[in-house]
Amino acid sequence: MPQSRTHSRTATKHIFVSGGVASSLGKGLTASSLGQLLTARGMRVTMQKLDPYLNVDPGTMNPFQHGEVFVTDDGAETDLDVGHYERFLDRDLSGQANVTTGQVYSTVIAKERRGEYLGDTVQVIPHITDEIKSRILAMSGPDLQGHQPDVVITEIGGTVGDIESQPFLEAARQVRHDVGRDNVFFLHVSLVPYLAPSGELKTKPTQHSVAALRNIGIQPDALILRCDREVPPALKNKIALMCDVDVDGCISTPDAPSIYDIPKVLHSEGLDAYVVRQLGLPFRDVDWTVWGNLLERVHQPRETVRIALVGKYVDLPDAYLSVTEALRAGGFANRSKVEISWVPSDACETEAGAQAALGDVDGVLIPGGFGIRGIEGKLGAIRYARHRKIPLLGLCLGLQCVVIEAARSVGLDDANSAEFEPETTHPVISTMADQEDVIAGEADLGGTMRLGAYPAVLTKGSVVARAYGSEEVSERHRHRYEVNNAYRDRIAKSGLRFSGTSPDGHLVEFVEYPADQHPFFVATQAHPELKSRPTRPHPLFAAFVDAALKHKLEERLPVDVHGEERAAVATDDELADSADRDEVASVDSAG
């Protein structure tokens, strides 16, 4: 006779977030917002994403298919939802926060090859599901500081019914059995579509989605009803009855004004209080001090600033998700709204193209990327911003392009990166020594870049040191190429300063033009956007947006005491002289 199981109500609680009917309903933001609410109630929350694709990680996936790759401090290449988790929880997560089918199968097959299964026939159940469970339960262990989480929120990627998601859902069902029903909460995100011709909200898709979930042994405790409008009480009652969920657990979530309003929406519907009651968590009121201040800055900006994001993947904004969130957070730091102008880098290859694309912006951001496509356009945008004193921030590839443009401006006409032109006579950007076997095709491409957090030392009094308020910083990285130190002296003749390096001085981490040459022209080999939080904006982005605001204010026409406008722009002769200088510089740097 099997023994009865007893479970402690004080154990770490597990919340599983699944999705149904359609993808892109906002499971990640829902999970992040619930995590934020529980954190604001004084609980220690950690989060995890289970991705059903067979890739080991998203590091080699096409940005147009997957969006950005979010890098953690420990060097894991993870799903972009992990970025949402870090931003909403305001805490760093490890590579454990992202589990893929590829990782699970790789581990299980490796164990089989080592003979760890003692001759068993290896199957999806129990071997694959056991490996998934071990990774879920590992999140409930102490963190690096020795703190055990009160709650683990696990988002299950895909939708119910996907064949790829079934092992993860089965593992989640087994976790409930293993740790006790009182310690597990299932939250299901479903679509309630509105049919305009009939003027009705339809509940059948949600009913079918919940039925599919129940077929595999999971009864949801609460439903997130996604719709473009409020779900009326009568419909909530119907869904509660047909899906066997408490009415208090039917949460209407219409589209919010901003993603930062989602916690307020969930709280107003009582989701966090319902979860606390169901899991027996200690009840504390939500402390809105920090998040309320954020919402005030989101909805009551004093200024608006326009930033051009000159990128290669602008057709899919998710490819730059952390960059755009960091820009917006930089705006919050300055009580300003950042409007992003999405500029395909190809559009800036010519002076006329750059003028058309960048003529009305207050700042230019050059993000990371790979490959030669669009590089000349990035160089054109950099040249345009340098000549016209428009604030610029370069990230990763952005730094490399800034260095190439500076080198070309001092006579190294064919200066280039070994990534784009392996045979260039002036490889001002070269392959890192430990990456040469990868470039030669003699090692794996995935997971082999310089990944994770690395320290840097900043030059005292530099623009970046003033922005950070420190001369020692740590930032996350993801790259294979570096500034070629053999060209540092020649590049410095352009006025560009190498204002931050690795502690040993070998690897260039930051470059800038001094403040007396340009109001703000900074680039970094790192990805500082990955450490920005809406409630704690990254200092580089805050300084960049501040410079863009000052640039905007300087462009305005002041009014004298008699009410007459005084021209705050150059005279026609001065503009003509400037255009001549720009044309000469453009021809000189184009080679």
From Swiss-Prot:
Residues 306-554 form the Glutamine amidotransferase type-1 domain. UTP binds at residues 23, 202-207, 238. One of its GO terms (biological process) is pyrimidine nucleobase biosynthetic process. Residues 1-281 are annotated as: Amidoligase domain. Mg(2+) binds at residues 81, 155. CTP binds at residues 23, 162-164, 202-207, 238. It comes from the Bacteria. Its EC number is 6.3.4.2. Pfam families: CTP_synth_N (PF06418), GATase (PF00117). The keyword Acetylation does not apply. The keyword ATP-binding applies. GO terms for molecular function: ATP binding; CTP synthase activity; glutaminase activity; identical protein binding; metal ion binding. Allosterically activated by GTP, when glutamine is the substrate; GTP has no effect on the reaction when ammonia is the substrate. The allosteric effector GTP functions by stabilizing the protein conformation that binds the tetrahedral intermediate(s) formed during glutamine hydrolysis. Inhibited by the product CTP, via allosteric rather than competitive inhibition. It catalyses: UTP + L-glutamine + ATP + H2O = CTP + L-glutamate + ADP + phosphate + 2 H(+); L-glutamine + H2O = L-glutamate + NH4(+); UTP + NH4(+) + ATP = CTP + ADP + phosphate + 2 H(+). ATP binds at residues 24-29, 81. Residues 568-591 are annotated as: Disordered. L-glutamine binds at residues 369, 397-400, 419, 480. GO terms for cellular component: cytosol. Homotetramer. HAMAP family: PyrG (MF_01227). Catalyzes the ATP-dependent amination of UTP to CTP with either L-glutamine or ammonia as the source of nitrogen. Regulates intracellular CTP levels through interactions with the four ribonucleotide triphosphates. Belongs to the CTP synthase family. CTPSs have evolved a hybrid strategy for distinguishing between UTP and CTP. The overlapping regions of the product feedback inhibitory and substrate sites recognize a common feature in both compounds, the triphosphate moiety. To differentiate isosteric substrate and product pyrimidine rings, an additional pocket far from the expected kinase/ligase catalytic site, specifically recognizes the cytosine and ribose portions of the product inhibitor. This is CTP synthase. The lineage of its organism: Bacteria, Bacillati, Actinomycetota, Actinomycetes, Mycobacteriales. The gene is pyrG.
